[in-house]
Design a protein with these regions (language model features):
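Beta-propeller domains
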Residues: 49-61, 69-108
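Conserved Ser/Thr-centered positions that define the repeating blades of beta-propeller domains
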Residues: 92-99, 136-137, 174-177, 229-230, ...
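Blade-level signature of beta-propeller repeat domains, shared across WD40, Kelch, NHL, RCC1
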Residues: 286-287, 292-320
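Beta-propeller fold detector
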Residues: 47-58, 100-110, 138, 144-151, ...
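Short beta-strand elements that form the blades of beta-propeller/WD-repeat-like
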Residues: 69-85, 117-130, 153-168, 208-220, ...
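Beta-rich interaction/scaffold domains
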Residues: 1-64, 142
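A detector of repeated loop/turn-to-beta-strand junctions in beta-rich toroidal repeat architectures
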Residues: 88, 222-224, 283-286
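Repeated scaffold domains used in trafficking and secretory/extracellular systems
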Residues: 58-73, 108-123, 145-162, 188-206, ...
């Protein structure tokens, strides 16, 4: 929005996703002509997201070849817990991933952590020990037992951790601290482990935030091809069969454009990409899938979205 006078500000840029006009005039004759400008890029690749050999960063470990690692967001920064190859643990934090400047130190925990269970929301971090005991921390120094035993942590929803607990041989949905969740027995086809990262969305069509998790491994040991959604109270199957059965995939927010009703501009809207993960035969999933309707339906991404040949074998990005 607004006007640009290129005689005065020759370095200004224009956002062509909206309606742009060019006004040409001759002051001497008090004549002007208005042109509507459009930028057509149909001869170019529609999506310039491409993988490059140099587009990588090393894990912020103290030693080489770490055994396990998981990174979450807490207090506006990335927090990474790393199990080193000598059995010690590193806690690394970074408030600017573009600068790739990590602060890291060896951390001694009063328990053996299940590194893959790490989850955080706002100012609180949750983690399970190797026996399933739940711990919390708000300062990354003091870990307090929550007095609960869980099978797994699915992720976080607003200010609480979401997971699964077991009682008398039955599995139930769990939440800490307890809010409005219906902590009923989980369905037989609900993934008990290996689901994707837990992502949250909210728009004008949702009365409360909705969290999604894709695929994973069910209690019977079989892998799931479903996407589950949680609205703060109940779980439902959002998509069934739209993805191949796998575990450890990653959900990543992305965006796309569609024409406005008038056709005069383009409107940006969010989409979800799913990449990585391991298939039932143990092979790495090399296909990137995309959902334009918040996880209800899934399609194979455009060729430019697919992994390049340089990432051969089993690339090391999958969620566990």
């Amino acid at each position: 929005t607004g006007e640009i006078d290129y005689e005065k500000t020759q370095t200004d840029s224009i956002d062509f996703t909206g309606e742009v006009t060019l006004t040409l005039g001759i002051k001497k004759f008090d004549v002007e002509k208005v042109y509507r400008l459009k930028v057509n890029v149909h001869k170019e690749e529609p999506d310039l997201l491409a993988w490059d050999e140099m587009a990588f960063a090393a894990l912020p470990s103290r030693l080489g070849s770490p055994l396990r690692q998981k990174t979450v967001e807490m207090k506006g920064m990335a927090v990474s817990l790393i199990e080193e190859n000598d059995g010690t643990y590193t806690l690394a934090t970074c408030d600017n991933l573009y600068a790739d400047t990590w602060k890291k130190h060896q951390i001694t925990l009063p328990f053996k952590p299940d590194t893959g269970s790490l989850a955080a929301s706002g100012t609180t971090l949750w983690i399970l020990d190797d026996a399933g005991n739940l711990y919390t921390t708000t300062d990354l120094e003091t870990f307090t037992p929550a007095g609960e035993k869980w099978l797994s942590i699915t992720g976080t929803y607003l200010d609480s951790a979401i997971g699964i607990r077991e009682e008398e041989g039955k599995r139930y949905f769990a939440q800490h601290p307890v809010r409005d969740m219906n902590q009923c027995e989980i369905p037989a086809d609900f993934p008990v482990s290996g689901a994707s990262n837990f992502v949250t969305l909210q728009n004008k069509w949702t009365s409360s935030p909705v969290a999604l998790a894709a695929c994973g491994r069910k209690a019977d040991g079989k892998m799931s091809d479903s996407v589950w959604a949680f609205d703060g109270k109940e779980w439902i199957i959002l998509s069934n069969g739209g993805l191949p059965a796998m575990e450890g995939a990653s959900l990543i927010p992305y965006y796309n454009y569609r024409p406005s009703h008038s056709g005069n501009s383009m409107i940006e809207y969010g989409v979800w990409m799913l990449l990585g993960g391991r298939m039932a035969d143990g092979s790495f999933n090399r296909t990137i899938y995309i959902s334009y309707d918040n996880g209800v339906t899934w399609h194979k991404g455009d060729s430019k979205l697919q992994l390049p040949d340089i990432l051969l074998g089993n690339p090391h990005f999958w969620c566990k």
